[in-house]
Structures are given as structure tokens and as C-alpha cells.
Amino acid sequence: MEGVFLKMSVVGVSPMIPVGPSSFICAIGGSVEEKSTAASLPRWVSLRRLRPLEFLRIGGKREEKGTVRDDDAVLLERRDRNRNENDNGNWVLKILEVGSIWKGKRQRSGGGGGGEEDEEEEVAEPKKKEDLCEECDFCRIDDDDEDEEKEKTVFEFSEMLSKIPVEDAQMFAKLSFLGNLAYSIPKIKPENLLKYQKLRFVTSSIEKRMSLKVEENNNGEEDEEKKKLINPAVAYRIAASAASRLFSHSKSVLPFGSSKRQDNEEASLLATADSVTAVVAAKEEVKQAVADDLKSNRSPPCEWFVCDDDKSGTRFFFIQGSDSLASWQANLLFEPVPFEDLDVLVHRGIYEAAKGIYEQMLPEVHAHLNSRGKNRAFLRFSGHSLGGSLSLLVNLMLLIRGQVPASSLLPVITFGSPCIMCGGDRLLQKLGLPKSHLLGISMHRDIVPRAFSCNYPNRAAKLLKALNGNFRNHPCLNNQNVLYSPMGKLLILQPSERFSPPHPLLPPGSGLYLLASKNTDETEKSLRAAKILFFNSPHPLEILSDRRSYGSEGKIKRNHDMSSYLKALRHVIRKELKQMKAERDQWLRKFFIINILFSGRDSLKLITRFVASRSSQLVIIFFLPIRLLIMSVYSVVFHHSQAHFSFFK
């Protein structure tokens, strides 16, 4: 990147294309296409007794067994093949579209929008850091932790990994399948959902709008005109160039990889990259207008649907990820604001979107509690990407606002969702909830969970603080160089090597792991350092600087798409079941041989005693072990059958 100059004009690109530096975006939220202690027992026996995720069950009972069927309510693979690239969430084009809208709003508001001087006039005297985040370990990483992070080896990281039992992985696969359906709600067939998944379809956000006779704000022709102004090839080129430039200035924070050289013409495209800057530096009235739009029923940021498990009394709420323009506006409005008037900071855009979805889902929550009773009604929230973050916030809002008792809220399970809170673990502790109340499943190289929890370069942090006063006293940014800290339990999913290269911190081969440690101060610090190490390897800037990350077959889509999570989980389940069967057969063979040896010796002694006494005429065969008799008969029959078949060949 030596010799790169920032030009104020763009070569070969129409000036009508407003774009944004994707290095700050990190592809937030789009759907773009405990170890066993019974060593003496075989794994197929011990896994039935050891349940590191037993808290997932309802009332201590296990859910109905069964693997995920391939012929479920909707054929996912067919949907993925037939989905148009414009419909599956082209995140770069969405960012460009958002940038143009925000830029227009800033111009209509009558200001250039948000330099440091303007922001100082608008923002009142900032609250002290202690007011929003008291002295605690939840949002602070001291120098010792940084040294520990640097010195942590692959072996130490692997010591904190525990494989998830197969039956729990099957439940995650079932939820991932249902989360995949959230992207094709109109195609859901209730009869198939009931037949294959034993779930009764209740309602969806689409049906809600139809029942309320609210017309969808569908400006198809206008959107087409906007899309014609944006060339996808140029968009990907701009994103790669912007990320590469920032990547070259941030090599110190990247544990792997190296920077790539870019030419001057390509670097000049960064001059028009202001989408994220337009959002961060926008005036408060513009942000509030967008926040009001996110809360409205007319243009919801994400679709969702509801289904019931009548056997367990559980109502499932599934929310899709970023698949609309409104959802991308929620993603880019990432400044921190207080959550529910508590001393915890949250992503503003996602919080505003959660308020609207909360109001839409509240009647369905009350209806389920009234029909089943509070002691027998349970609620499960889940979602992919942005939908997972919305599920978490709606779940916590129901508890904080006193609408649902804590006993009715099952753990929230997210797939590829970003971290959106600063001090989230402390909030769970205050609410009396365990960390296992949030189970975040992350693909080993998914960029979205890393987006807000990776180490931000000092240049990026200074820029955010200069553009927006809310970042100047942000505890996570000041203490950890991250926007939002991880919370809850982290589960890492590694697919097969044919699907994606393995992660250097994980064992070879596919698997689903829980990153956990014992509940002590020292191990908690080590756990936080391990999470930071994982979220920075690979660093999002390294992913964005690779041109192979973009497009319908790029790394970003492949490692983040909801169908990828489902395929990886199914592969892990098949692999574990096959390995368990092999271990069980081997254990039975050893048991059979040992039984023959000990029983055969006793039989021989008994035969000798009877023959010596001449008391009776006995057939020796009755003194042989019954297992040996069965196996002998089977071998004889099998031998003759083989000879019979070979005779006809």
C-alpha cells in the first residue's frame, strides 16, 4: 500500500454511486447466500449420562429424539439454488443503498452532518464512564489479560473446548432448519411442519400485516432505478479496496495473513466511500427519524414466524437476519445507547428495531401464557445474524418489563449473530440469569460475530470518537478496543475441510465445541482472553481485504449463510453417529471375547467333572456359552448362503 494517494475524484465510476467503507461494516447481519469423565466407558454409553447442555431441556426432561429430516417443511437446498442473488442479501449493494439514503437525509436536514464541532454542540456534557459502567471486570481487559492473550497457545485454547453431545447437536440442527425457514415464510406448509417437525404453525409477521390491513411499502420500480446505478463488480471492488487500505495500516492487530498491494486507481475509489460515515456522523434528528422507521409496522427490519410444540408447551419465535433495506439501516446505526434505562450499553439500531418487534410479538406471548398457564408455558427465541440479536433483546425486554416470568424463558439460541452489548454478562447476573441463557453458535470463520468484538485499530477508534460523541465515553472501546463485548456462552462450529479450511485454534475435522471454563476468577480471565483470541483470528479486516470473500460464492456468504450452519451441523451429527457406532461395535467385540474366555474356562471345568464322574451322558454343546453357539450357527449359515449365491453367478 506504499504510494497510495487519496484522490477527491473517482476514475471510471459514475459520481451517482454513493458507497461506504466496508472496513467498518464487517458484513453485519446478512444472510448472503464438557469433556467426558467416564474414561472407562465407551462414548456411546457415557454420552447418554453426561449432559453439559442439560439446561436446554424443559423441566429436566429431554426433548423427542430424532435427527433432522431432509424432506422437511421446505426443501432448503432447492430454495438456495433458485434464490436470486438480489434476493439473498447482497450486503455490499445494501450498504451502498443505505449510504445514498442517509446522505440524502443529511442534505435535507440542512447540514453537512456531523463534524466534530457540530457533534460537540449537540451532545450534552457526557456522562462519566463510571455512571454507565461501574468498576467491574465485565468491560475491562487489563495489561495482564493482553499478555495472556498473546501468550495463549493452541493447546491452551483447546483445553477450554468441550464437544457438544449428539442429541444437543440434533436440537441445534432442528432450530437452524426452522431459522432457515424464516427466509421463506410464504413457502412454509403448515401440514409439512406438523408432520416432520411436530410443530404447529401459529402466525407470522406477514400474516400480522395482512390482518391489520397494512399495505407493505413496496417501491419496486424506484428500487430498480437505484440498483441500475450500482454495478456489483464496482461495489465489490470498492469494498475490497477500502478494507485493504485500512488493513495495511492495521497489521499489528492481525494474528495471521499479510497485506496486499493495491494500485493508485483502485485506492482512489475510497474517496466516495462515505456510507458508514454518513450514518455515524448524522445529526440526531436524522437518526431519530430512522429509529422511528425501524419501530414501525409498515416496514419491519426482519420477518419472523411463530410455531408451537404442543407436547412440551413451548412456543418458538424465529427471526430472520438482514434481508431488507430497513435491516441494513439498523445494522449501520451502531452507536451505543443505554438499554432499558440500565447501566448497560447496547447497539442503537438493533435496539430500536427490537422495540418494534417486541410490540408485534407481545400479543402472541400473552396468548400462549394465558392458554397454557405461566407454570406450563415456555418461550424459545432464536434467530440468525441480526435476527439472533433481536431475539436476545426481545427476550430480555419481556423479563425486564415484567411481562414474562424468568421460569418461562428458555435459553436464547443464535446463529452467526454479532455481539451488541457492553456489559451483557453483568446484566444477566443482575437479572438472576446464568450465562447459559444465551447460546451463541458461531461458524469458525464467520465474519459477523467478529464484527463488533474484534480489536479496532486506534485510527478507527479515534475516527469514531471524532464523528460521534457517544463513542468518546464508550467503556468497551476505551478499555478493550472493541465496540461490544461477548456475552453468554460461545459455541464454535467447524464444518468439514471440503466446505471451508479448518481454523488454526480448533482440532482438525468437523465438530461443535463449547468454549467454557470453571467458575473461578482466574479461569474467567482466561476465558475472556480466549474469546478475544478467537474473534481476532482471523481479523475481519483480513477477511475483507481478500477478494475471494466477495460475491455469491465468496467466503463471507459461505461462512455466514444460514443454510451453511444447517449443513455443517448435519455433517457433524452424521460424523458423530458414525463414530459412536464404530466405538460401540468395537466395545461389543471386546466384551464378547472376554465373556467367551471366562465362560469357556468354567464350561471346560464342568465338562471334565461330569466326564470323570460318569454320572450322565451329556452333550458338550450345552456347556458352551450361548453367544458362541449363536455366532457359530450364524457363521455356518452365512458360509452356505455365500456358496449358494456364488453358485448362481
From Swiss-Prot:
Family: Belongs to the AB hydrolase superfamily. Lipase family.
Xref: CDD domains: Lipase_3
Class of this enzyme: hydrolase
UniProt function note: Sn-1-specific phospholipase A1 that catalyzes the initial step of oxylipins and jasmonate (JA) biosynthesis. Hydrolyzes polyunsaturated acyl groups preferentially from chloroplastic phosphatidylglycerol (PG). May function downstream of abscisic acid (ABA), and provide a link between ABA-mediated abiotic stress responses and oxylipin and JA signalings. In vitro, possesses broad substrate specificity.
One Pfam family recorded for the sequence: Lipase_3
Keyword annotations: Chloroplast, Hydrolase, Lipid degradation, Lipid metabolism, Membrane, Plastid, Transit peptide
GO function term, MF aspect, one: phospholipase A1 activity
A cellular component term, taken from the record's GO annotations: chloroplast membrane
SUPFAM superfamilies hit by this protein: alpha/beta-Hydrolases
Membrane topology: Peripheral membrane protein
Active site: S385 (acyl-ester intermediate), D446 (charge relay system), H560 (charge relay system)
One of the GO BP terms on file: positive regulation of defense response
Further comment found in the protein's record: Plants overexpressing PLIP3 exhibit stunted growth and accumulate anthocyanin under normal growth conditions.
GXSXG (motif): residue ranges: 383-387
Transit peptide: 1-26
InterPro entries reported for this sequence: AB_hydrolase_fold, Fungal_lipase-type, PLIP1/2/3
Entry protein name: Phospholipase A1 PLIP3, chloroplastic
Region: Disordered, residue numbers: 104-128
EC identifiers of the protein: 3.1.1.32, 3.1.1.26
Subcellular localization, as worded in the UniProt entry: Plastid, Chloroplast membrane
Reactions catalysed: a 1,2-diacyl-3-O-(beta-D-galactosyl)-sn-glycerol + 2 H2O = 3-beta-D-galactosyl-sn-glycerol + 2 a fatty acid + 2 H(+); a 1,2-diacyl-sn-glycero-3-phosphocholine + H2O = a 2-acyl-sn-glycero-3-phosphocholine + a fatty acid + H(+); 1-hexadecanoyl-2-(9Z-octadecenoyl)-sn-glycero-3-phosphocholine + H2O = 2-(9Z-octadecenoyl)-sn-glycero-3-phosphocholine + hexadecanoate + H(+); 1-(9Z-octadecenoyl)-2-hexadecanoyl-sn-glycero-3-phosphocholine + H2O = 2-hexadecanoyl-sn-glycero-3-phosphocholine + (9Z)-octadecenoate + H(+)
Chief subcellular location: plastid
Keyword Chloroplast assigned: yes
Induction section of the entry: Induced by abscisic acid (ABA) and cold stress.
